[in-house]
């Protein structure tokens, strides 16, 4: 059985499956994704007494522009503080030029958290100081979009020391021994391997360097990366992640210790730690929301 809900962190993920213009036409807002993420997080506020954070990936941004945004808060009311800061930006834009808030291209280039993929986390600290550096999402940054990794989770691994030693055996030199850093670097290691193998393959096939990234995006085997990364993990976990180019995942431990649920339709793919949270946010029936089976992963490709 899992721990009581009050002793667990919470996750929330939203992937928009339509162009942002679609949500303006149907719902009258360019902020549909982040508004829904806020609801998902507020409805899990019991899981986030010690901190909250969220990140967003913008699709198809040109080189030289920021395509991942992240904000975290360890304030007394972290969810409120988090979204007050984010929404203040949108209020300022609306006040200065109301038309811009409905201009998708302008918003993507000039406003943060205006993308297609969102990940939120609520921290209930079981150990470790309530330092903002301990808050999720955590990031592994790289100039290659397909090597960027954003991670958030609800987990408690029991063999962190063993996993840390495996990282050292790979030749890495981690600066922390926490399970968060260990998981981030473990997935990152196999993500790097997959990227490098695909790069060598497509370079050998004669593709130009500038073309190879698109082929890596198309052929990246996220399932294999997760299988290799989690092979020796022992304990409970529900982990959500985003890659810089737009792939995303939610994976769950084989024993089903940590919960995770999802819903999908033609507009969105949504995941969260609690079924009723998804139901009430999207006005769904109980049977509409599916459980991510123990030992399985929900994988969302950038292609949809």
Where in this protein do the model-derived segments appear?
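Conserved short alpha-helical segments that host acidic/polar catalytic motifs at enzyme active sites
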Residues: 1-304
């Amino acid at each position: 059985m899992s721990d009581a809900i009050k002793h667990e962190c919470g996750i929330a993920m939203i992937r928009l499956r339509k162009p942002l213009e679609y949500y303006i036409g149907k719902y009258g807002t360019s902020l549909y994704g982040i508004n829904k993420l806020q609801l998902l997080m507020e409805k899990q506020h019991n899981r986030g007494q010690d901190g909250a954070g969220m990140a967003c990936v913008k699709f198809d941004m040109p080189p030289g522009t920021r395509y991942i945004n992240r904000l975290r808060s360890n304030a007394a009311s972290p969810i409120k503080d988090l979204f007050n800061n984010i929404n203040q930006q949108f209020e300022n834009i609306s006040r200065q030029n109301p038309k811009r808030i409905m201009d998708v291209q302008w918003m993507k280039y000039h406003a943060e958290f205006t993308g297609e993929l969102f990940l939120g986390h609520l921290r209930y600290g079981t150990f470790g100081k309530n330092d903002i550096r301990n808050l999720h999402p955590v990031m592994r940054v790289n100039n290659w979009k397909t090597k960027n990794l954003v991670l958030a989770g609800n987990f408690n691994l029991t063999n962190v020391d063993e996993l840390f030693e495996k990282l050292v055996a790979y030749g890495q030199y981690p600066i922390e021994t926490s399970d968060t850093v260990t998981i981030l670097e473990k997935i990152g290691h196999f993500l790097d391997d997959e990227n490098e193998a695909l790069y060598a393959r497509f370079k050998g096939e004669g593709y130009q360097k500038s073309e190879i990234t698109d082929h890596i995006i198309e052929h990246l085997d996220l399932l294999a990366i997760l299988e290799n990364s989690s092979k020796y993990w022992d304990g409970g976990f529900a982990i959500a992640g985003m890659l810089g180019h737009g792939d995303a995942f939610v994976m769950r431990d084989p024993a089903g210790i940590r919960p995770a649920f999802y819903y999908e339709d033609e507009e969105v793919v949504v995941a969260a730690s609690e079924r009723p949270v998804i139901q009430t946010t999207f006005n769904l029936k109980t049977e509409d929301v599916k459980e991510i089976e123990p030992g399985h992963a929900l994988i969302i490709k950038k292609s949809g």
